[in-house]
Design a protein with these regions (language model features):
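S/T-rich, low-complexity, solvent-exposed segments of bacterial secretion/appendage proteins
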Residues: 1-367
Length: 367
């Protein structure tokens, strides 16, 4: 039979093993709010048995190792959601600025249009009122300024987005370089039979940060962890990183290039960088087109109706706004063509007190 010392040794060994397990639990609790931390578990194994007098006795328990608990599918889902979050937040911030441009009642185009039609309505009640005529010209110039301010504000947003592209690319390159280094450390520790849990946690957190910046794909290969863009452009392979580049080249705008020199700007869809490029390359051009179309169509329609009337001297009406032959840069070139209030063609029959043409001009508000 085993002696007292053997029994005591088994008991001590059991206490040490379970103390180690308690330490793991305490460490898990302490790191509950640590970004990237993965819960660890203690692996307890039966100690080697021993024989005495042809009888086999148990050797107790040993603490084999600590092991991080990872759900790879859940981790990939976190990366996907983080990409979407980065993309959505970037677009929301940019669109909030755009909304301010058009919804501002004091400076927005919509508010300026309403104010302009209000002054036309007031003039229609007394077409010979010089002050009311001057108010129409003043509000018309305010409308022109609102178009110019909208163009300037959209350009400012676009410039800010464009400048952020190389900054985001630099962030991506720093993260991929750090991830590649940690990849090498993980491989080295695994080769030595060590548990790389802490290093893997650090790597997972960096990958999460990276996924907030761009759409990435994470795969485990025989060479270790591999990161690519969603379209397969390599970012990290084992302990080697591949830096992206951002430059304008022959373009006015910043483009993103792979380490091999391929323009991958259009391939980047997710993360902050994807959101930035989507607003810059798709949303803003559409807004410029809509703004220019509005300026061109409004100026053309108003000029056509204005020319159908007569001014205070009984002369045929002329262009009220500067003619805009094309929609290109129409908002930037929008302006008032007349400076003399008496040239406002209020009359429909040439008589001084007629407001017939003004009523037709006011009716354009509903078109």
């Amino acid at each position: 039979m085993p002696g007292l010392n053997t029994s005591l040794n088994i008991a001590v060994q059991a206490l040490e093993a379970n103390q180690g397990a308690l330490n793991v639990t305490s460490n898990n609790i302490a790191n509950v709010n640590t970004p990237g931390y993965s819960r660890q578990i203690a692996i307890l194994n039966e100690a080697p048995t021993f024989q005495e007098n042809n009888i086999t006795f148990g050797g107790g328990v040993t603490l084999e190792q600590f092991q991080s608990v990872r759900d790879q599918l859940l981790q990939l889902r976190i990366y996907e959601e983080t990409q979407q979050q980065g993309n959505s937040e970037t677009q929301f911030n940019s669109l909030s600025q755009v909304e301010g441009i058009f919804s501002d009642p004091s400076q927005g185009v919509g508010g300026a249009l309403s104010a302009f039609f209000n002054t036309l309505s007031q003039l229609s009640t007394n077409p010979t009122d010089a002050n009311a005529r001057q108010a129409v010209l003043t509000s018309a110039n305010n409308l022109a300024n609102s178009f110019h301010q909208a163009v300037s504000a959209l350009n400012t947003i676009g410039t800010g987005l464009d400048r952020s592209v190389p900054q985001t690319v630099d962030q991506i390159n720093r993260l991929t370089s750090q991830i590649a280094t940690l990849n090498g450390q993980v491989a080295q520790m695994q080769g030595l039979g060590k548990e790389p849990g802490t290093v893997q946690d650090q790597r997972d957190e960096l990958i999460r940060q990276l996924s907030n910046l761009a759409n990435i794909s994470v795969t485990q290969t025989e060479h270790g962890l591999t990161l690519t863009t969603a379209n397969g452009v390599p970012l990290v392979v084992a302990n080697q990183s591949f830096a992206l580049q951002a430059n304008a080249n022959n373009s006015v705008l910043e483009h993103v290039y792979s380490a091999q020199g391929q323009d991958i700007t259009s391939q980047i869809q997710g993360g902050q960088l994807g959101g930035t490029l989507q607003i810059r390359d798709q949303v803003l051009p559409q807004l410029f087109t809509q703004l220019n179309n509005l300026a061109s169509q409004f100026a053309t329609s108003f000029n056509t109706q204005h020319a159908a009337g007569f001014d205070a001297s009984g002369n045929a009406g002329q262009n009220f706004f500067n003619p805009l032959p094309t929609t290109t840069d129409a908002a930037a070139n929008f302006g008032v063509a007349i400076t003399d209030p008496s040239l406002i063609a209020a009359s429909s029959d040439g008589s001084a007190g007629s407001n017939g043409n003004l009523e037709q001009l006011v009716a354009l508000r509903n078109q």
